[in-house]
Every structure is written in structure tokens, then in C-alpha cells.
Amino acid sequence: MPFDEKYFSTHTYANVTFAKYSMYWWSNRFYATLARRYGRKGARLLEVGSGMGHLIGSLEDTFETYGMDLNHWAVKQSKAVIKKTNLQTASAQELPFKDGVFNVVIIKHIVEHLPDPKKALREIGRVTEKGGTLILATPNLDSLLKPWKGDKWIGYQDPTHISLKHPDEWSYLIEKAGFDLVDIFSDGFWDVPYVRFIPKQIQKLIFGSLGGFQAVTGWVFLPYRWGESVMMIARKRK
């Protein structure tokens, strides 16, 4: 399936709202907190797969921001609302940037869509400066509650998820791309419902409270198996 306007209206994005205080608003705020924590103020930051530009736009006040996406439509939409960020259409597997120019690279829920994520991570390693930071997130095949969902697990619902891997496989590819893993954690259990006969809203409180607390506070504490996404922080070797 092509990554065009139809993709954003029929798959994961179809029911997504980025309104203030929504789940995705808090999620982007959390990623922005991580970028500011590990990045150098005023340095260049790249988001690979910037989509509609919600995350990269929130970082314009801290970094010299760059965003790229394979989706022409998404880049066009982003340009209509983001004014400072350098946005362009490009492939994650062939980044149109010089070597070692970025202090921070964010690739959030993109690698699972790529036919060759190994090549994409090598490209990210190439454009990241020595000592720079990679922030990566992808569906977590080792999630403790994934067996409860079976075939209905969120990671299986998008047919473009063609490169799902276990966290140890991702960490291996990241290290082969020239990075050292700094931290690995998760974003909590948000793929409700997990059990029958309990109202969905109650399950959000039961299962989602820890992930919500982590997102709101910016305090990273959830073990990597305690959630539907695995998140990795890595540092480019000097």
C-alpha cells in the first residue's frame, strides 16, 4: 500500500486526534522531552518519518529542525502549518543529508514499515554526529500482554508493518549501525481492551496509568516488556 493521503485516513491515523491533552499529544510531548534531554540546544535534529509534523513542529524552539517523509501528501500538509523546519520528501533508506550533521535523530514507529530497516539504520548512523543521539520506537513483540491480544494485537493491525522484530534484534541492528545502546524502556499498555467483561474506560485506568504517568512526568521507568512499544536511546560511537 502506498503511503499517501488514503493511508492516513484508513489505518492507524484514521482515529487519531492530536488535540491538546489527547493521548497522542502527550506521546509527542514525551518524545520532545527526550529529545531536549539528550540533545544539544540549537543543534540540528532530524525526524525520519515526520508524518503530519506534530512532533517536529514542537521542537522548532529548541533545535534547528529537519523532517522528512516518504509521503508527499504528509509533507505538503506539514509545510502548511510548520514554518521553521526544513521539510522534504525522501526515503529513510536513502537520506539526502551529508555525513555527521545531526545531533539528534528521531525515528518513531517507522522502522517496522521499511523493507530494509538495516539499511535505514546504517543511513541514520551515517548522518548522526559522533556522540549524537538516536531515539527509536517500534511495536514491541516482547510485550507482556501481547499474548492476551493474539491476532488482534495493535502491531498486527497495519498491513504495512512488514518488519516487526524483537527488541534484541533491533538493538543488534542499532549497534551494527555505529551506536551504543544507552537505555531501553516502554510506553505502557494502551492497546485496550485486554480482557472481556471489563469496560474499556476502566481498563484504560488499570492498564494505562503507568504509561500515562511516564508520559506526563517525563520520568522514564517502565521496563521494556511493560508496553506495546519498545523505545531505545542510543549514542553514536566516537
Explain the meaning of each model-derived region.
Residues P139-H161:
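Short, glycine-/aromatic-enriched active-site segment of Class I SAM-dependent methyltransferases
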Residues K118-K130:
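A short glycine-rich, Lys/Arg-flanked "PGG" loop and its adjoining helix->strand segment in the class I
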Residues I162-A177:
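Short alpha-helix
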Residues H109-H113:
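A short His-aromatic
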Residues K149-G150, D183-K238:
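A C-terminal cap/extension of S-adenosyl-L-methionine-dependent methyltransferases
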Residues P115-K119, K146:
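Short N-terminal helix/helix-N-cap motif within the alpha/beta-hydrolase-1
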Residues M1-K98, V104-K108, L121, F185, ...:
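Conserved N-terminal segment of class I S-adenosyl-L-methionine
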Residues G132-T138:
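Conserved beta-strand signature within the Rossmann-like core of class I S-adenosyl-L-methionine
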